[in-house]
């Protein structure tokens, strides 16, 4: 699912065109689930094909039980007994270490093969039976995933599809991955329990406060311009990860958080109701406005839940103009035509769109499987268009969506703002400080991105506090969240992950010649002496014939030389004789 933001021009000349093209949407507390998908990749002639053959969702409570994945197959043709092999569940050494890229776990017939089974008495087979069965109702297949909670599914699991159990090579590769997606249709938001919402806000602010000192130190102007710290994408990523974890989005490990270089780092999330606690602008100092902040747009909805003012009444479910100038409470802002401010002047909003919003980092969440597919397309610019036709991608889930799904930005945050009298001053200050830190990041990234977009060397120096520790994917800077839920900055680890991503979606390589099969390879110590003996027996007659011909030739030449030797007349008398 691709997250969308609303970018509106600042000029007032084309207001109808702005909102005709992109209408902001309401946030209805969307639900997110872990979704499994199976993709089949095969070749016909010189053309490669890739198609998502089936999906299955875990329960809203998480992937706690075995999952049944229904799917179809396109590459097996009329074969009735296909076989699936995975490398991860092999127990034999030879099955795990021989011909991994070619056979994908089944170089021998004694390897762990998931042969198709018959339907069980209850209609489908349980995990105790064969996990790979045929669905007689739909004509497709069912694969039972016994451990959907395992991190390997988020990384992506690659398997081989064999037409039969005696096939030498797979006819296609199967990729199964688990991603975090928004559930459609989004259910209606429910009333939030006030004590729970207050507790959630307190937990969130405590995390923000613990990291605030370091962030403020990084963002505060130094005493000397020569000692100014460069902007760090890593700071933005860590801030977003902390907010996400504090908001209750769990299982964020073995994944990537990415920031787009050409997109603002902050996004304004519309709130469903007006701010309840308001004061006159004279009673509070007016904070500096923050321009060019996009408004988050939920693609599943067409209207905003609440607006203070709007040029078109159809854009909002409910509109209520303020009776006086207001000041937003801690953690909240007024969004008017891409500009954030803490105060709202009731006399100047009649011709503009103004909504109450919260502020979160604009990041994208990828699983390893998703990023591997995207990396394989970007590895060669010549093949991006061709591969994109056969490899549709679920790009990821916006961090703004994740926070909204957890209650922030809708019921929980709104109710907490309305109940600020029950919160301590320290909690209120922490929320406000967090928003100010993100606002400072917004101002820095706007100036930095303009220079970095034209100078990759400068960009490399600005990606992290201690060097280039982000993975560049097109125009996105991605950081890896390891198994501990922390941003990994180890360069060696990142390089290893980058190589794995480049190799993960490599096309199915042609199999080796028959004489290089693993079975034949094990017989080579016995076959080599036999082959040498056969070779000697084949060459011996030729060699003997050659040697015999050479001996005969040498004998003939020697005999002829003796016959043709020059004749010399023998003397008839003694030369020393004198008569």
Curated annotation (Swiss-Prot):
Residues 23-523 are extracellular. Residues 1-22 form the signal peptide. GO terms for cellular component: plasma membrane. It is a single-pass membrane protein. Residues 388-579 are annotated as: Transmembrane protein. Residues 388-408 are annotated as: Fusion peptide. This envelope protein is encoded by a baboon specific provirus. It has no ortholog in human. This is ERV-BabFcenv provirus ancestral Env polyprotein. It comes from Papio anubis.
